[in-house]
Amino acid sequence: MPRSQRNDNFIDKTFTVVADILLRVIPTTRREKEAFSYYRDGMSAQSEGEYAEALQNYYEAMRLEIDPYDRSYILYNIGLIHTSNGQHTKALEYYLQALERNPALPQAFNNMAVICHYRGEQAIQQGDPENAEAWFDQAADYWKQGIALAPSNYIEAQNWLKITGRLKA
C-alpha cells in the first residue's frame, strides 16, 4: 500500500487529499502524476524519520520528474536527509544541484551555510583557526545569498554576519 494511503496524522491526510484532488483537476501527464506521488510519499516518510524509505521515493521521483524546478525540491529534500544523517559532504552536493536547477531556494543557501559554520566550529575545536576562518567565510557567502533572496528571514545569520564583520564583505 502506498504511504499516502496509510498516513496517520491529520496534516498528512489533509495534504494527501488536497494533492490527490489537484492531480485529478490539473492537466498533467501520467508520468508527472507518478513522480509527484513518489515525491509526496518521500515527504511523508521523511517527516516520520523513515529516511531510507524517503530516499527510495525521492530517487524514483527524480527518475520520473523532468521539470527542473520540481527536481530542485526533490534534490533539496535529499540534501535535508543527508544533513540529518550527518553526511554533510553529500548534503552540500545535493543542495548545490538543487540550486543549479532553481537558484531561488534561500533555504538551500541557509542549510549550506549552517553546514559550513558547523565545520568552522569543528576546525576551531581541532585547533585549526585558518581552516575555521575559511569555513566561516564560506558560510557567510552562502548566508548572504540566502538573505538576498529572503531579506526578512535568517535573522540569527544576519546578526552573526554583523557581529563577525562579514556583513559587507
UniProtKB/Swiss-Prot annotation:
Keywords: Chloroplast, Membrane, Photosynthesis, Plastid, Repeat, Thylakoid, TPR repeat. One of its GO terms (cellular component) is chloroplast thylakoid membrane. One of its GO terms (biological process) is photosynthesis. PROSITE patterns: TPR, TPR_REGION. It is a peripheral membrane protein. The keyword Ribosomal protein does not apply. Belongs to the Ycf3 family. Essential for the assembly of the photosystem I (PSI) complex. May act as a chaperone-like factor to guide the assembly of the PSI subunits. This is Photosystem I assembly protein Ycf3.
